[in-house]
């Protein structure tokens, strides 16, 4: 089953949802993810960091910041999103996909949700296929502009480096221990490919 049913039921609230008076959620923007006041820790404190990774990741972060500044935060591309749509947060119940765990739900770019679907798997060969399935379902409720689709790799890198920070700041957790330094090492190729493509 693809994520189509989950998308139809849960994801694109931004186009029809009216924000109630007094409603507040945090924002997942560049600063919250990769800035100095990042919510899940500093990417520089990822496991196994060295001078080469600090330089490579730093150049990637700079490019992400520049691209997202150009991309903007207009209401057609930024609003309330789930912000943690990884596979562990999809539940199949009676043949239907349900989205769970809205703890991290907040205001962000809609295409950021596409990147969160691939959390911890961004480096695997099948990862792009997950995004294609996600887009298939997403397009049943909302058109995706070419500029949005073209920026998905930026959101993938934003998420990946945010997870590098999370692993570093949660090093005692079972998940972080299972990922270890290898997760940071596997990020090197992703950063290099991103810089070649967009740098």
What is the role of each PLM region?
Residues 144-156:
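All-alpha amphipathic helical-bundle segments outside canonical DNA-binding/catalytic cores
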Residues 44-46, 163-199:
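ATP/Mg2+ or Mg2+-diphosphate-binding catalytic cores
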Residues 107-112, 186, 190:
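Gly/Ser/Thr-rich active-site loops/lids in small-molecule metabolic enzymes
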Residues 54-70:
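Mechanochemical coupling/switch segment within NTP-driven translocation systems
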Residues 26-31, 154-166:
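Hydrophobic alpha-helical segments that form the core
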Residues 7, 65-111:
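Active-site acidic catalytic loop and adjacent metal/ATP-binding pocket
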Residues 110-143, 159-175:
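Active-site activation/catalytic loop segments of kinase-like enzymes and analogous catalytic loops
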């Amino acid at each position: 089953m693809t994520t189509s049913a989950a998308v139809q039921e849960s994801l694109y609230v931004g186009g029809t949802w009216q924000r109630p008076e007094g409603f507040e959620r945090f924002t997942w923007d560049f600063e919250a993810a990769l800035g100095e006041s990042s919510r899940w820790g500093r990417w520089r404190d990822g496991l196994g960091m060295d001078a080469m990774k600090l330089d490579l990741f730093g150049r990637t972060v700079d490019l992400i910041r520049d691209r997202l500044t150009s991309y903007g935060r207009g209401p057609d591309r930024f609003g309330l999103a789930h912000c943690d749509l990884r596979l562990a947060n999809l539940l199949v119940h009676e043949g239907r996909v349900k989205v769970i765990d809205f703890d991290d739900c907040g205001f962000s770019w809609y295409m950021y949700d596409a990147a969160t679907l691939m959390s911890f798997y961004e480096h695997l060969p099948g990862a792009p296929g997950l995004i294609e399935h996600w887009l298939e379902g997403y397009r049943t409720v909302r058109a995706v502009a070419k500029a949005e689709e073209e920026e998905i790799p930026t959101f993938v890198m934003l998420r990946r480096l945010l997870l590098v920070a999370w692993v570093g700041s949660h090093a005692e957790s079972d998940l972080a221990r299972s990922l270890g330094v290898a997760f940071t090492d596997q990020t090197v190729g992703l950063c290099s490919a991103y810089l070649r493509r967009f740098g």
